[in-house]
């Protein structure tokens, strides 16, 4: 086992990364090894997908499968060995299918089929024992003694960034958004990473390419969500419990939420969002369901307590899931799509009757809590609509600075930095937030500036796209570069989606971003220095010191 993809990975003087019997996330060594083998098989599929494309062969089904299966290897997504093995076996079948199509096309064209690298040649074992025996060939740091640590760090930056992009591709696909060119670029990068490079410049360029690719993917996801559900609008949301039977929907998949709402109409069941599903409450399409009553709980790391206290059924539509046995709710939590936990019921297809039956059998909330509301829904359209008023307030001096504070949440004590930062921002500044990092301060009162709320909840982590659009619009109005705006970006990271959002911002030339609370363990000191010199990227320090720098206070 070797896994170093998330913030909570083991860090010791002897080396970084989870490499024992179990990772800090709860992932067993066997699961980690099977995930590495799955990635290896997917890279082999991409090798043939690239070659097939050169001869005009495009398989949309395979284009969708590869990022979806890759998504299953993200932090806190799938801990079920059987499901991971099934993905690997399907990858082997697709690779064989593409190989046959490619070789037939070569024969028809009268050309010789090209040799493929080792990553596209492995004959996958048929049992778990055989697959685990093959896993060392796919170990991410298998050549660590022969490769400089900076090269290893760049490889992992690319791999983990592409994982984040794969997740957004799958979210977009669920909403009907696919693009053959995007899929082609994805396969090219997967294929490249399947042949471990020692070219630092090429790896760095690839990291930026992943950022650019993800920008296109975020635009696709934005289109998918707004075409399906309308543009989010400022919305007041209750965050307390409501009497009645209950279902809690966590993750990121709004299509699943829509299906659950449709299937619970007239059933006497209240539906709550959780975590990154909170932004769904701002979409017009969901407002026609009166039994979508609010948001319950906070960010992913608190789920073992929050789900244990929730008196209904829980559905995990995507990341992040953690051990449901700790809170003794494994018999009433359900997984969807790429999510998996051993022993937890997995919902195939679009029939949520098992979830509904479980909710009806449980007690539900026995009384209404006194409501506590927050305002959400300041995504792209709402931000652009407010842009003229924002511009006028900037020109008048009422608004002097913008902060984007968001990203992933986590359970480290030093994440209180983001709470204190938000509370310490000047009263003449606006705070944009997104991702589950918002839960560090989204229930606090920040007031407004001439009717414009100081705290603007942009949405999910992928809605960084909305914030980027606002920054571009403001830069155009003020005839300046984005980096010349009075804008400070402070991103909390935990896993691979945050990594690819960061790569997206860097690829767009955005500078002076702060990340925290700790730097990724796979980034060496040399790489961190290069990123600081090239982009001004730096780690958070103290709220007082960082604010002085961001506000140019002597």
Curated annotation (Swiss-Prot):
Name under which the protein is recorded: Hydroxylamine reductase
Cofactors: [2Fe-2S] cluster; hybrid [4Fe-2O-2S] cluster
Keywords: 2Fe-2S, Cytoplasm, Iron, Iron-sulfur, Metal-binding, Oxidoreductase
Pfam families membership: Prismane
Binding-site residues for [2Fe-2S] cluster, renumbered to this chain: 3, 6, 18, 25
Reactions catalysed, as given in the entry: A + NH4(+) + H2O = hydroxylamine + AH2 + H(+)
Top-level taxonomy: Bacteria, Pseudomonadati, Pseudomonadota, Gammaproteobacteria, Alteromonadales
Cofactor binding notes: Binds 1 [2Fe-2S] cluster. Binds 1 hybrid [4Fe-2O-2S] cluster.
Family membership noted in the UniProt record: Belongs to the HCP family.
Domain of life from the UniProt record: Bacteria
Organism: Shewanella baltica (strain OS223)
GO biological process, one term: response to hydrogen peroxide
InterPro entries: HCP/CODH (IPR004137), Hydroxylam_reduct (IPR010048), Prismane-like_a/b-sand (IPR016099), Prismane-like_sf (IPR011254), Prismane_a-bundle (IPR016100)
Annotated function: Catalyzes the reduction of hydroxylamine to form NH(3) and H(2)O.
GO CC annotation: cytoplasm
Cited Gene3D superfamilies: 1.20.1270.20, 3.40.50.2030
Sequence positions bearing Cysteine persulfide: 408
NCBIfam families for this protein: hybrid_clust (TIGR01703), PRK05290.1 (NF003658)
Gene that this polypeptide is encoded by: hcp
Record: residues binding hybrid [4Fe-2O-2S] cluster: 252, 276, 320, 408, 436, 461, 495, 497
EC assignment: 1.7.99.1
């Amino acid at each position: 086992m070797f896994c170093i993809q998330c913030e909570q990975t083991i860090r010791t003087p002897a080396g970084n990364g989870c490499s024992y019997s179990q990772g800090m996330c709860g992932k067993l060594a066997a699961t980690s090894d099977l995930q590495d083998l799955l990635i290896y098989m997917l890279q082999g599929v991409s090798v043939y997908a690239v070659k097939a494309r050169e001869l005009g062969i495009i398989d949309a089904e395979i284009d969708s499968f590869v990022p979806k299966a890759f998504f299953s290897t993200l932090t806190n997504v799938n801990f079920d060995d059987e499901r991971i093995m099934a993905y690997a076996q399907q990858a082997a079948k697709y690779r064989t299918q593409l190989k046959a199509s490619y070789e037939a096309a070569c024969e028809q064209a009268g050309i010789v089929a090209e040799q493929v690298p080792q990553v596209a040649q492995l004959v996958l074992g048929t049992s778990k024992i055989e697959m685990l025996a093959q896993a060392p060939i796919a170990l991410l740091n298998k050549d660590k003694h022969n490769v400089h640590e900076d090269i290893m760090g760049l490889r992992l930056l690319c791999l983990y960034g592409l994982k984040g992009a794969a997740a957004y591709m799958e979210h977009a696909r669920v909403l009907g958004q696919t693009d053959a060119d995007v899929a082609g670029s994805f396969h090219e990068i997967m294929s490249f990473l399947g042949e471990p490079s020692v070219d630092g410049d090429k790896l760095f360029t690839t990291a930026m390419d992943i950022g650019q690719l993800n920008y296109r993917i975020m635009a696709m996801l934005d289109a998918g969500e707004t075409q399906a559900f309308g543009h989010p609008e400022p919305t007041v949301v209750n965050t307390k419990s409501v009497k009645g039977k209950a279902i809690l929907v966590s993750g990121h998949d709004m299509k699943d939420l829509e299906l659950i709402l449709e299937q619970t109409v007239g059933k006497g069941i209240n539906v709550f969002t959780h975590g990154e599903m909170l932004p769904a409450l701002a979409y017009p399409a969901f407002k026609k369901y009166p039994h979508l009553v609010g948001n319950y709980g906070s960010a992913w790391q608190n789920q073992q307590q929050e789900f244990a206290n929730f008196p209904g059924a829980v559905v995990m539509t995507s990341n992040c899931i953690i051990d449901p046995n700790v809170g003794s709710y494994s018999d009433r939590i359900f997984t969807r799509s790429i999510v998996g936990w051993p022993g937890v019921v997995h919902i195939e297809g679009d029939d949520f009757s098992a979830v509904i039956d479980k909710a009806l059998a449980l007690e539900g909330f026995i009384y209404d809590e006194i409501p506590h509301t927050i305002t959400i829904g300041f995504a792209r359209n709402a931000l652009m609509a407010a842009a003229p008023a924002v511009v006028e307030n900037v020109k008048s001096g009422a608004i002097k600075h913008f902060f984007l504070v968001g990203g992933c949440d986590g359970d480290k004590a030093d994440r209180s930095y983001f709470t204190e930062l938000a509370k310490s921002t000047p009263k003449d500044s606006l705070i944009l937030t997104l991702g589950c990092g918002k839960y560090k301060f989204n229930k606090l009162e920040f007031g407004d500036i001439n009717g414009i709320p100081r705290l603007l909840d942009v949405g999910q982590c992928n809605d960084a796209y909305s914030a980027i659009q606002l920054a571009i619009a403001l830069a155009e109005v003020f005839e300046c570069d984005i980096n010349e705006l009075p804008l400070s970006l402070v991103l909390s990271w935990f896993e691979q989606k945050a990594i690819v959002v960061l790569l997206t911002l860097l690829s767009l030339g955005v500078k002076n971003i702060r990340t925290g609370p700790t730097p990724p363990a796979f980034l060496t000191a040399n790489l961190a220095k290069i990123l600081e010199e090239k982009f001004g990227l730096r780690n958070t320090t103290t709220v007082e010191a960082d604010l002085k720098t961001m506000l140019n206070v002597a």
